[in-house]
Regions:
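Intrinsically disordered, charged low-complexity linkers and terminal tails
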Residues: 1-141
């Protein structure tokens, strides 16, 4: 069985930012492995990664995206600009964003830091609605 190919961060960023381009108060400040944007005079750093099953057998209820260690994250850690880690569920065409105040302190803590989401919630998203869900997971820093 061939291994599934997931879109890379650059492709995910392009697709996401393309959806925002017609918003009147939207600006791309810079775009590399991390996007730096401004919306309504508020700045954000964005990093994109696909959400996949946690392990085998799959699909499991718990999905995850892994945030890698990156040199570019060092300056972001020191910045006051919020960092948004945005996962994309290819199968359900849904974006997941983890709480910035929980993500930013974990930047570059390990080679990869995992963030989890629930498949059942992703499957039940209704187009045009923003669903806010808080799920508590234990993690090892």
């Amino acid at each position: 069985m061939a291994r599934r190919q997931y879109p890379k961060g650059e492709e995910l960023a392009k697709s996401f930012l393309n959806k925002l381009k017609n918003y009147p108060n939207f600006e791309i400040i810079s775009q590399s492995d991390v996007c730096h944007i401004r919306i309504d005079n508020n700045e954000y750093f964005l990093y994109f990664k696909c959400v996949t099953h946690e392990g085998k057998p799959y699909p499991l209820e718990r999905q995850r995206a892994q945030l890698p260690k990156r040199e570019s994250f060092e300056a972001i850690k020191k910045s006051i600009v919020p960092f948004l880690f945005i996962g994309y569920d290819v199968d359900n065409d849904v974006y997941i964003c983890w709480e910035p105040s929980k993500v930013k302190p974990r930047l570059n803590k390990k080679t990869y830091v995992s963030f989890y989401s629930r498949l059942s919630i992703q499957r039940n998203v209704v187009e045009g609605e923003i669903k806010v869900t808080i799920a508590l997971y234990r993690y090892h820093a």
